[in-house]
Amino acid sequence: MAPPPPSPPPVSLKVSLLLLRVLTGVFLVIALIILSTNSVTIVSQGSALKFHFKDVYAYRYMLSAAVIGLLYAVIQLFFTISEFATGMKNPFNYQLDFYGDKLISYLVATGSAAGFGVSKDLKDAFIALVALDSTDPVDKFFSRGYASASLLLFSFICLAVLSVFSSLAIAKRN
């Protein structure tokens, strides 16, 4: 005899999960916008050098992590909305939630860590080479890197909470 199907989660839990998915997507979209528009022109000895986010490998990794995280968040948002509307959850979604939330949360966390690390290291290097103050465009470039990394960190926190809920859901199911 098959075990009875698990009872559906309360509506407040479903709304919380939906809100966390939306917040994850919003944080990732804002991080993508800030990071992808991040550039600076450095004028040195009469020549101008345009410096983009894509010139820093860690920022590229951040961008990749944010894009992959956003794709996952959008897919999960559709599944969450469909579950919310129908009241039924496909058994495959338990596995997708469980493994996907963990994998993507770690990807986003490492993207955030890479952004914080490279922003600090490169900013310290620029301070050592030239007198850098808070009005310098180079400082603003790294501040935008910090902002993007912070937003990735916030999205990681949302994904980590979702990961806990998906772990509990799969434990209840089994």
Curated annotation (Swiss-Prot):
One of its GO terms (cellular component) is plasma membrane. Pfam families: CASP_dom. InterPro entries: CASP_dom. Keywords: Cell membrane, Membrane, Transmembrane, Transmembrane helix. Residues 36-60, 172-174 are extracellular. It is found in: Cell membrane. Residues 1-14, 82-150 are cytoplasmic. The chain crosses the membrane at residues 15-35, 61-81, 151-171. It is a multi-pass membrane protein. Homodimer and heterodimers. Belongs to the Casparian strip membrane proteins (CASP) family. This is CASP-like protein 4D2.
